[in-house]
């Protein structure tokens, strides 16, 4: 494992994890989205996603999904990298990158392209590419 790759992935996974955990907390604290500008996004979610009356009355379910799908897995990836668990870490990083890219594709479908989502797609792509590089390099 190259030190620069490990360090870069620790920084990237922690950055994504902290953002997702912060977003989940924000959605729990202000589930209407009024205080942080998310209310218009809730209307788009209701229009495009299934079961809007169940899952999109407010942002609480979305916050829990954000935490479970992006926040905690990214945090796990960072911890595995920090602890140097090299047998499993690249696989978790790869999964996190793919999951993040799929999440962003869903965001694009609901809200369209925007700079933040585009940037996070690149983050997911970087994670996946780095994990693949790491896995290929470790087989040599």
Question: What function would you assign to each model-found segment?
Answer:
Residues 2-140:
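Topology signature of small-to-medium multi-pass alpha-helical membrane proteins
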């Amino acid at each position: 494992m190259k030190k620069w790759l490990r360090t870069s992935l620790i920084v990237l996974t922690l950055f994504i994890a902290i953002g997702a955990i912060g977003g989940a907390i924000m959605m729990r604290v202000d589930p209407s989205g009024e205080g942080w500008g998310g209310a218009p996004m809730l209307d788009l979610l209701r229009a495009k996603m299934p079961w809007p009356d169940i899952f999109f009355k407010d942002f609480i379910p979305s916050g829990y999904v954000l935490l479970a799908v992006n926040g905690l897995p990214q945090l796990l990836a960072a911890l595995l990298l920090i602890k140097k668990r090299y047998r499993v870490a690249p696989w978790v990083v790869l999964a996190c990158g793919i999951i993040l890219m799929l999440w962003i594709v869903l965001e694009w479908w609901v809200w369209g392209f925007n700079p933040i989502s585009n940037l996070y797609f690149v983050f997911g792509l970087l994670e996946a590419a780095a994990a693949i590089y790491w896995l290929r390099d470790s087989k040599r």
